[in-house]
Amino acid sequence: VSVLLRDDFEQRDLAPSVSLERRRPAVPVNELVEHFVAALDFLDENGVAVHLCLVCDRWTSVSADRTLIEGLLLGLSLRACDHMHQGGLLSLETTRVRLDENAFEETDLPPGEYVRVSVSDTGGWSEGAENAWTTRVGSPRRLERPSLAALRHAAEIAGGALVCARHACCGERANLYLPATRRHVRPVITST
């Protein structure tokens, strides 16, 4: 009897997740990035400036969990700031891209429309940086930072992919690919 109840529970547990997946609201990507950057007020104290380049139009959204995307952006931004020990420029960019089999960057994503959110820094890279930023011992806040593997896994959970590239003496660029959607625009009828 316990096996039947367990199987029955698992089936009921799966059904709501499928319906929630379909009803996931579209997240306007540019708005999300702008609100996220507004919350990064602590960067000025560290000598880090922020540059935004929002190429996506205002109707482009992503079909992923908003909180998960914000967590990914926070993890990638903190990682970038850790590379800029003496200050620098943190850049966030949104672009709508079409991935196909011949895509420039290697991802396991199916062909289709995606939003690429790029987070890059101008700091130098040190070989010990990956280990140093998982926990900052000297930090007054003792922030625990997610590893690059954890960020990649979170991107997969969001239905996307994370591709990072190091550039000698000029920082790192992380490209987060998320499934793109278009928000429906209701026409406004005005009388003249």
PLM regions with names:
Residues 20, 57-63, 67:
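A short, conserved loop immediately preceding a beta-strand within the C-terminal catalytic
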Residues 25-41, 75-78, 93-106, 111-113:
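Short beta-to-alpha transition helix within the HATPase_c
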Residues 159-166, 174:
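Glycine-rich ATP-binding loops of the HATPase_c
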Residues 149-158:
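Detector for a conserved hydrophobic position within an alpha-helical segment of the HATPase_c
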Residues 43-53, 86-89:
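Short conserved segments within the C-terminal catalytic ATPase subdomain
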Residues 96-146, 189-191:
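Glycine-rich/acidic phosphate-handling loop/turn and adjacent ATP-lid/helix
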Residues 120, 171-181:
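Short C-terminal beta-strand
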Residues 49-60, 95-97:
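Conserved catalytic submotifs in the C-terminal HATPase_c
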